[in-house]
């Protein structure tokens, strides 16, 4: 691990920082001894090196950029450095601190009595993120992200540094980084090394676009700590074993990478939607409905399941509770719970844009422009129109239209076959009705007074007379008819008069 700086005016400040680092290492060593782990962790070394790098921010001739790459979208920048072996680690750390992320740093700083120290945050992939406090020169608070390192593969001292920042921004733009000066540059106060590195940066960007060599070296993100062969030496006097290349830390697929981050964190059991039974009373039913519920499929306690697909959008729930094991649920509702809908026929009744289906528990709202009306509506449309001049009557059936046309033409094809009767009729039902006048058949019987009629319309008119005088509902008339039939069929009725005694 290199020293904070042997020359320069910041020796006193560097000594203070080293005291803080030694206190941190002492505390970490004490914690590791308590946990029966005597090996110094790699994250501690990286934290100390990040603190050492802080000593050079106040001596820079240029201000540190605020998120140089994060505002321009997903940009991958490679920096090629050709420097001497002793100077390479210092440039490496100065460049690594520029690989920063958007300024939303986590509020996980560790309190201390003296100078604030950086806090170490390890994400789900094992990459260490070090939050640095603001520098005295007014530098912004940023995050420094370390990339995974590999052991040196040869005597070459060329190092490729890659900054990967995924951030929502604008179109990518070329980025220039102010580089950290080495010890020799601080002593001579010259910017030749910075200009040389910027030239290498532009040349490398052109080369990368031409041959795409860096594309073949992309690997998926791995933990920053290697299992063996640590890249940072623990001795202050040794500077050997520095990496020759830095692997690019890019996810292969953003969607799959996000799923891998989220999946192992927490697994929340998803409960089923609630049971929502909504029953609307209909006139004549006394507000009593039976709701048939399917047996639930092993739901945990407290979860509820919906029955109707359209019940979730209704605004007036009636019953809400846990699912029943099995069987039938009877819901008894007061008559004033819901507004009484109009009585509908057995097929379909339309009220404006509301379609009341025969067995539906709630009305289904359909737009008048939609072509999804039930099939029964098409069968009840008046498609047959009379084309006689001045008559535009419509009918449901073609036979009815033909019978109507005979009234215009005067045609009467149905003739009575009774002896001495030559009457003709335009419709067959009229002929059948006329035949009953010859036979005397009266097939329509009143259920109240047992009067018989030849025609059904005559019976309807007679029954209406009963309803207006006695105010007897139709179902009571049917019950009275059944009672009379039962009394007539029972032998030895008590209502029969007793024979007179002689």
From Swiss-Prot:
PANTHER family hit by this protein: KRUEPPEL-LIKE FACTOR 11, KRUEPPEL-LIKE TRANSCRIPTION FACTOR
Identify the keywords attached in UniProt to this record, alphabetized. Answer: Activator, Apoptosis, DNA-binding, Metal-binding, Nucleus, Repeat, Repressor, Transcription, Transcription regulation, Zinc, Zinc-finger
This protein's GO CC annotations: cytosol; focal adhesion; nuclear body; nucleus
Q: Tell me what this protein is called.
A: Krueppel-like factor 11
> How does it associate, per the subunit comment?
Interacts with SIN3A.
Where is it located? Nucleus
Give the family per the record. Belongs to the Sp1 C2H2-type zinc-finger protein family.
Q: Which PROSITE patterns does this entry report, sorted A to Z?
A: ZINC_FINGER_C2H2_1, ZINC_FINGER_C2H2_2
Q: Which SMART domains match?
A: ZnF_C2H2
Chain spans, region Disordered: 133-156, 169-194
Q: Which GO terms describe its molecular function?
A: DNA binding; DNA-binding transcription factor activity; DNA-binding transcription factor activity, RNA polymerase II-specific; transcription cis-regulatory region binding; zinc ion binding
